[in-house]
Amino acid sequence: MNVDRSSLSPMMMQYFEVKDKYPDHIVFFRLGDFYEMFFDDAVTVSRALELTLTGRDCGQAERAPMCGIPYHSAEIYIKKLIDLGFRVAICEQMEDPKLAKGIVKRDVIRIVTPGTLTESNLLDDSKNNFIGALYVHEGNAAICFADISTGTAELFTHKDKTAPELTEALINEISRFSPAELLFNAEAADMTEVREFIRTRMNLGVTVMKEEDFSPVHSDVLLKQFSADSFTDIGIDEKDACAVAVLCGLFYYISDTQRAAVGRFTEIQTYSDKRFMELDLTARRNLELCETMRNKEKRGSLLWVLDRTKTSMGKRLLKSYIEQPLIKPAAIIDRLDAVEELTSDMIRLSQLGDALDGVYDLERLMTRVMYKTANPRDLKALAQTALKMPDIKHLLADCRTSLIKGLCGKIHELSEISALVGNAINDDPPPLLKDGGVIKDGFNPELDRLRNIIKNGKSIIDDIENKEKERTGIKNLKIGYNRVFGYYIEVTKSYYDLVPAEYIRKQTIANAERFITDELKKAEEEISGASEHVLVLEAEIFAEVRDFIASKLAEVQETAQAVAALDVLCSFADVSMRNRYVKPDIAIDGVIDIKGGRHPVVELMTDELYVPNDTYLDTSSRRMAVITGPNMSGKSTYMRQTALIVLMAQIGCFVPADYAKISIVDRIFTRVGASDDLTAGQSTFMVEMSEVADILKHATKQSLVILDEVGRGTSTFDGISIATAVAEHIANTRKIGCKTMFATHYHELIGLEGRVDGVKNYSVAVKKYGDSIKFLRKIVEGGVDDSYGIEVAKLAGLPKNVINRAKEILSEMEREKAEGRKASADGQISFGALNDEEVLSRLRKTNPDEFSPADAKLFLQEICDMLK
């Protein structure tokens, strides 16, 4: 709204000076015990939060629109505004209003955005709250995700990628980290596919920052965040322009919003080299790693099964483990050995669980300490957690595996923190420092003296009164109090002649005079000022304790990381024992051999007895398993089960099987299920083909590919042709030759076995009872050419008349098919004739000079197969 500022009151002028600096933010303007909003902000917030819109005199004829919230409960309102897409500028009083001369000084102390929240009650303990920054320049890119609430920072760099490859990589990283907020440079903002993905799938805002915000001139701000002197100290190559730019831009933004260049972060994890299994968005979604496809819930996901963690830090790390399986055998074996050692002693595992159960979120507590927003209960939680560390180290003392020994060495006892907080902070302190009663009696002599004044104020006045009676001989002398004069000595007129000369007359009343003395005035000042002085001194002592804890950041951060890792390993051990998992053998010979494998989620969510199945895949004779069988028979579950067992092994967890030998895979690809991407204007078939194309482009010999019903979104002949061509391409060792599970209802693919090297047929066993069938859920060797579609429809509950009609139509079609074969034998046009034409077409296009002997043999075999 337009406001004539010429007649505004001084305070309103001050408000507009702040608002002009933050025109796109809601300004929380501190007035006493409230944060007030004025004019447009007031109207907006009153509607958004359903607050009463009032008014305040502002120096103009009309009152300024105003709404307010108590400052002590501001967090919940801030979170609501952030969730609605607003950003909030906190404008605080920078001096005591009682001591201010004129208008109280105010300034913005913090800007709250979705990615810069640090308050524990505003965040999900089990999830990181990432803010991401993307910098793109001339085809190269760097993207960094930081969680200021935990001090976590992860950097990815991309060089020499094609535009589609870069787009795919960035979308995968953004979807995996699921940031609360994103910062782009202008060139990044021009990547329309990335922006469209964020708009339609992520539902989060993007801030396009100026190019100068990413300038190396901000490197000092970046290095202060890491308490470092150079880029080398934080593991960054200064010549990597994109990496330097994205880090400078991101941490400049963090410093600007937090109004502090605090050394909260200790390291940057860099991922320019290949250290983890790659899982794209499709694989993470189809395998339901952290949430279900249907309801987006944790229950029913792999994370739900594996999460027996006790700490918030462990929960966040577990999610990271699941989304980033290892590919280095030594690292995987270290985790598996650690889990095995933990499962070997149930008593120790139980005691570790009890100890971890009392550990608070060290990472987020330390963030609030570093940003000076920690409250008394935060420090107490830190101290209580510190007290648990000696117990945890003692329980790990006898462990022999290298990983657990390493973690034990990184857990610091933090005894100085627990001792200082234990001595200084009351056992049950108030949540707010201003409430008083935070510092223990006996910790600070001056504080004890002030508290004694408050406690014994009446006694002090009584002592002065008795002393003055005795000194002056005025028997009816008494000390009183009122708000105007404070404490005073009252003497009746009959004793005027005994009043000492040093008494200072303050008031005359009927039949009496009131006086003050220097001693009484000093006592009054001590009594009335003691409460205020207590709060000031408590704040100073609290700040000293907090700053001491801040000096221990490196120790606390290392301890937090080690405790989180231990928590995840204990969770793996607990789940493995409860669910009868086995330790997998990790191999590099290309073999996946699973005996009695089970789906980790389905077996826990079904009331039926789960039917285990074996799986064998290698890189030679059994690269591809073609799986046929009816719908609903369990093909998809079986394939997902295999993928999840491989993934569980590579995150270092035991697996649901009787035995498992797992060779490392570099990627898991999935093409499972059908879901129209309507928001992107893509049909089921288009999505399916895009996913298949991605697999054919990126799969390597070390990959695991899961394909379910490829080609079903188009005509039968098109579908069969596409499915066959895809299977042949993947199975061909000169093209990909990776381990593949291919479920299909195209029974024509059964013919691949024997014709294409490395293909083996499997099917789901079915038992037929007259017109009914029973799914045995057992995978057996050999293909089947009956999909039992009508029987499945009957099980699904289709009406009897529809089932009967379907049987009639099926009989007619089978009869026509038989007659067609007879007509073909009589010389009529048939599919065989079409095959002949196809053979001739292939031969016409073939140049024998381009064939090697091996190629010629393979080509001749294909021609023979076509003529059969």
Segments (PLM) and residue ranges:
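Conserved nucleotide-binding/hydrolysis modules and their immediate coupling elements
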Residues: 469, 473-474
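Charged catalytic and DNA/RNA-contacting regions of genome-maintenance
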Residues: 1-341, 350, 354-370, 374-466
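Beta-sheet entry/capping signal
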Residues: 25-28, 34, 85-89, 180-181, ...
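Hydrophobic alpha-helical segments characteristic of transmembrane helices
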Residues: 550, 555-571
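Amphipathic alpha-helical transducer elements in NTP-driven molecular machines
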Residues: 8-12, 28, 39, 68-78, ...
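ATPase nucleotide-binding head domains, primarily ABC-like/P-loop NTPase cores
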Residues: 39-42, 240, 310-311, 321, ...
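Extended, charged coiled-coil "arm/hinge" scaffolds of SMC/Rad50-like chromosome-maintenance ATPases
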Residues: 509, 513-547
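Amphipathic heptad-repeat alpha-helical coiled-coil/stalk segments that mediate oligomerization
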Residues: 142, 214-225, 277-278, 289, ...
